[in-house]
Amino acid sequence: METTVQKKRILSGIQPSGNLTLGSYLGAIKNWAALADEYDCYYMMADMHTITVRQVPADLRRNTLTQLAAYIASGLDPEKNVLFVQSHVPAHAQLGWVLDCYTMFGELSRMTQFKDKSAKNADNINAGLFTYPALMAGDILLYQADLVPVGGDQKQHVEICRDIANRFNGIYGETFKIPEPYIPTVGARVMSLTSPENKMSKSDKDPNGCVYMLEKPEDIMRKFKKAVTDSEACVRYDIANKPGVSNLMQIYAVSTGKTFEEIEAEFAGRGYGDFKKAVGESVVEMLRPIREETERLLADKAYLETIYRSGAERASRVADRTVSKVYKKVGFLAR
């Protein structure tokens, strides 16, 4: 009699706070599509986290649907992956509150993203912005995730999640699986085209610093032509001394499959103009089918609705079991 090997489970998500960036695609979504055969994958539109910063309601709804379409267009098969909207699974809020009560003030105070977002949103430093690591821990622990795909700058979130889970398990006995960060080696952190010392972000003050997944080809090319390099005029990977060129090399490597050595040889003796044009063209061609398929999917709202409704049902079956277990452990009276 054959025994079925239980797949390890992965949970990740992106806030639908605007257009998905090239950094989101190369650093996360592109890698997710290849994981479904090996892992049990759950991917969410993290809309509850999004409202820690004020949103225009109609834009949030549109961005959430567009993000779902982009997930599917990027190769996330809804049959193989559980795709869902965070707010459609009430267990996230339920577990998030319980974990708030097992998360220390000092832990939250040390979170670097709270400091960064507080500085950028000084007129709206709300409690949700402060406690969102506890909600994020709930997102992960609800599904008893083994692995959490994150960028190198997000390891702190997995670390506090592990601390919270270990604390809860220490008090009540084994309840949560302790997750590990899953960090891809290439494309894990795409930097701004205009400030390569900073991560590419939709909140970049210079609009030319960020490329979007669904952007028009001519706009993508324009941004790459303006990308910051240096005065050396030599395509060589050196992250410390040539951050702009190294960032472009990393983008080109991921979009073409070429090694850094092959890229250096390809552009030996050629100027940065040729190099930036080639990087831009490779990104345009990589994103073209995704943009076209996203547009096609957005024209079929009924199909997308079936996907997010089914995803919420599948996610809730797992999440509700965890919440029931946690409620019993902390002493809540069963309904």
List the model feature ranges, each with a label.
Residues 82-85, 149, 232:
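Short catalytic-loop micro-motif centered on adjacent basic/acidic residues
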Residues 105-109, 142-149, 253-263:
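Short helix-capping/linker segments at secondary-structure and domain boundaries
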Residues 116-168, 172, 192:
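Internal, conserved structured core segments that host functional sites
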Residues 2-138, 282-285, 295:
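N-terminal Rossmann-like or analogous alpha/beta NTP/dinucleotide-binding catalytic cores
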Residues 156, 162-335:
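Conserved nucleotide- and phosphate/pyrophosphate-binding catalytic cores
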Residues 56-57, 148-151, 235:
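Short, polar/flexible loop-turn hinges at active-site or ligand-entry regions and domain interfaces
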Residues 14-16, 47-49, 146-147, 204, ...:
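Short, histidine-centered active-site or binding-site loop motifs used for metal coordination
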